[in-house]
């Protein structure tokens, strides 16, 4: 034996490597794992044998850090928590968990416990460089090691801690919103249902160490089970997340014309659709769907038929349609070329995009947007977060339009904004009125520069839509009207007129000839439109209600109103608003009277054979069963008698107010001079 040991020390005899290989195979995971560290949590909460109390509180907060590569527990966190809602533990809870009342009394509240747990996590992040998968993007580098939380079921983080924080209005750490359910993973991997944590360990030949239902011991045994499953080839993945799923957001940008670099060429940019993925789960294929700009050079002397995009010829109409943002969707490369700057979108270097409007692009008659890319470090933005411009191809100022004085544009003016008018008697614009006024507009056309037109005719120095300062005829908060006679440097490019809209004309409210002669006087410096094409009254599209007016009372509209002769009111008005009591009496449906005992009488019908069969009567609703029952009364009345009484009462009320009824459902006001009725306002309502 001494010789053999000496030979081993001198290295003459090699040791057998079978044992070392077997032990290394057991400790090393077979499959490549995404998470290098796992934090196993197993809470213990208050409980009762009868189950009457449904709100459970955490009384033990354990957590252990497991190294996936070697299966060792490198750090532990453990504390007892004071219950606030039910501070006294039940005997069943003490017997089950082994936690006594003194331990929870010496513990800390849950809010302080979460703060201590957060400090422990931050310490691990600094020492071991771990990182968690959260919805909030973090600047993770290659040195960071991914970590996830593991529980035996969803109860710990999905029920117990979640609802307790909601009840107590406490902020839960965001890193606890996602975890791995080891019980569900065990069931899927081994294809069998485990019988508790102890049963799952026994199935794999692992002995449970410690005390069951002890939070720290359960966490350690769960870590053993997770390490064994990883060695068997199970890949740990997130099974539950409380974070809201951020769906893909598609941003569609219209085709835009970028400012021309010289007078012989113009760059036409086509911004495509990009999909912004959720930053919680970054996709490696994000660069495939990034936004891009395809830059083309259109020569000066080319014909419209020779225009090409990506090597494909296009026509004049298609080129104009692409400029308007309706066509031209092409492929989506992974880079963007904007104003000569190559910018990588997605997971590349961060660029800060700002939106601006180029004045040189006003030659096209539309508002165009351009990007300016400047490198900027944005710590609040994660990987794949890109700020996109939201400039829409639209006309934002009425100064860039010419609106004609024909009747086709009247309906368009009503849809744009409130019509602005200028009085003829004034030399300068003032407050607009609706009478003796005229509206100064130019022709409704939008000048759009074609890519194939001669760009030399459209000088860059001539900005379309720029007017002389003295050319403003009227200006308000929402409207600016220019004098077209003073307008200078009008572009000679091709124009596209807006399709005309036929306005609905009204002939019943046309002004008289005297009013037309009076309004024919025009301002000396501003052109006027023809009054024959103007409709001063636009009837509503739909009548909201019908007004019934008495012809004989239309002449007298002053207060007080004196009724000198009877007025006949239509039956519709009478039936709708006047004398509901009389109407109910005529139809036979009246309100049941009150009986002697203060209750509402009940309407019954005679069913026995005889002369009164079928007649209705009212009696007390409480039936008198015997002589001892004294709750009811002996009230009885025929319905005809009740109707007559109701009619007599309504007649007395109307006679006191000076109105009498006749058989033809018309009422008459008393014409006595001493009983005139005046309609006037109360002193508090007078102005």
From Swiss-Prot:
Which parts of the sequence bind AMP? 44, 213
Which SMART domains would you find in this protein's record?
A: EXOIII
Q: Which Gene3D superfamilies match?
A: Ribonuclease H-like superfamily/Ribonuclease H (3.30.420.10)
Kindly list the GO molecular function terms attached to this UniProt entry: 3'-5'-RNA exonuclease activity; nucleic acid binding; zinc ion binding
Q: Which InterPro entries match?
A: 3-5_Exoribonuclease, ERI-1_3'hExo-like, Exonuclease_RNaseT/DNA_pol3, RNaseH-like_sf, RNaseH_sf, Znf_GRF
The top EC class is: hydrolase
Q: How is this protein named in the record?
A: ERI1 exoribonuclease 2
**Lineage, uppermost ranks:** Eukaryota, Metazoa, Chordata, Craniata, Vertebrata
User: What gene does the UniProt entry assign to this protein?
Assistant: eri2
């Amino acid at each position: 034996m001494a010789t053999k040991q000496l030979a081993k020390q001198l290295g003459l005899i090699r040791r057998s490597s079978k044992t070392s290989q077997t032990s290394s195979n057991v400790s090393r995971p077979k499959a490549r794992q995404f998470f290098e560290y796992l934090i196993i949590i197993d809470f213990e909460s208050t409980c009762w044998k009868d189950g009457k109390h449904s709100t459970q509180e955490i009384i033990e907060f354990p957590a252990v850090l497991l190294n996936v590569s070697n299966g060792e527990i490198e750090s532990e966190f453990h504390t007892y928590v004071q219950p606030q809602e039910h501070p006294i533990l039940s005997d069943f809870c003490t017997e089950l968990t082994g936690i006594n009342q003194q331990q929870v009394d010496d513990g800390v509240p849950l809010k302080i416990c979460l703060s201590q747990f957060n400090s422990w996590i931050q310490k691990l992040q600094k020492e071991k460089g771990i990182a968690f998968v959260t919805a909030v993007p973090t600047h993770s580098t290659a040195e960071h090691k991914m970590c996830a939380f593991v529980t035996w079921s969803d109860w710990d983080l999905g029920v117990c801690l979640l609802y307790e924080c909601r009840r107590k209005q406490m902020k839960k750490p965001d890193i606890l919103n996602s975890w791995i359910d080891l019980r569900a993973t065990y069931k899927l991997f081994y294809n069998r249902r485990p019988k508790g944590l102890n049963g799952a360990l026994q199935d794999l030949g692992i002995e449970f160490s410690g005390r069951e239902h002890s939070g720290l011991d359960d966490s350690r045994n769960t870590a053993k089970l997770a390490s064994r499953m990883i060695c068997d080839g199970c890949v740990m993945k997130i099974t539950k997340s409380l974070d809201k799923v951020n769906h893909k957001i598609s941003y569609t940008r219209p085709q835009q014309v970028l400012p021309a670099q010289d007078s012989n060429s113009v760059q036409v940019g086509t911004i495509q659709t990009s999909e912004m993925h959720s930053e919680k789960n970054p996709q490696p294929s994000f660069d495939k769907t990034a936004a891009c700009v395809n830059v083309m050079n259109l020569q000066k002397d080319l014909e419209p038929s020779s225009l090409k995009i990506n090597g494909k010829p296009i026509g004049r109409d298609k080129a104009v349609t692409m400029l308007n943002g309706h066509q031209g969707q092409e492929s989506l490369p992974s880079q963007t070329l904007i104003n000569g700057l190559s910018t990588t979108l997605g997971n590349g270097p961060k660029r800060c995009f700002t939106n601006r409007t180029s004045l040189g692009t006003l030659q096209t008659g539309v508002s165009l947007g351009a990007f300016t890319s400047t490198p900027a470090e944005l710590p609040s933005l994660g990987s794949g977060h890109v700020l996109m411009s939201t400039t829409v191809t639209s006309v934002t100022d009425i100064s860039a339009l010419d609106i004609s004085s024909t009747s086709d544009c009247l309906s368009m003016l009503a849809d744009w904004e409130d019509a602005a008018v200028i009085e003829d008697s004034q030399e300068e614009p003032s407050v607009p009125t609706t009478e003796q006024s005229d509206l100064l507009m130019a022709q409704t056309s939008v000048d759009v520069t074609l890519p194939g037109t001669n760009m030399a005719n459209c000088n860059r120095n001539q900005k379309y839509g720029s007017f002389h300062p003295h050319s403003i005829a009227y200006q308000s908060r929402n409207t600016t009207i220019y004098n077209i006679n003073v307008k200078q440097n009008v572009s000679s490019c091709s124009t596209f007129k807006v399709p005309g809209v036929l306005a609905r004309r009204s002939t019943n409210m046309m002004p008289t000839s005297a009013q037309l002669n009076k309004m024919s006087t025009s301002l000396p410096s501003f052109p006027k439109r023809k009054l024959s094409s103007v409709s001063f009254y636009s009837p509503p599209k739909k009548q909201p209600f019908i007004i019934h007016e008495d012809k004989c009372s239309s002449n007298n509209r002053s207060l007080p109103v004196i009724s000198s002769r009877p007025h006949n009111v239509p039956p519709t008005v009478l039936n709708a608003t006047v004398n509901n009591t009389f109407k109910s009496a005529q139809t036979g449906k009246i309100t049941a009277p009150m009986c002697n005992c203060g209750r509402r009488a009940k309407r019954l019908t005679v069913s026995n054979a005889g002369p009164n069969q079928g007649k209705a009567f009212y009696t007390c609703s409480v039936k008198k069963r015997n002589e001892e029952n004294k709750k009811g009364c002996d009230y009885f009345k025929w319905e005809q008698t009740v109707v007559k009484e109701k009619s007599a009462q309504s007649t007395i009320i109307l006679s006191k107010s000076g109105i009498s009824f006749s058989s033809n459902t018309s009422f008459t006001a008393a014409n006595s001079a001493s009983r005139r009725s005046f309609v006037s306002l109360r002193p508090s309502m007078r102005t």
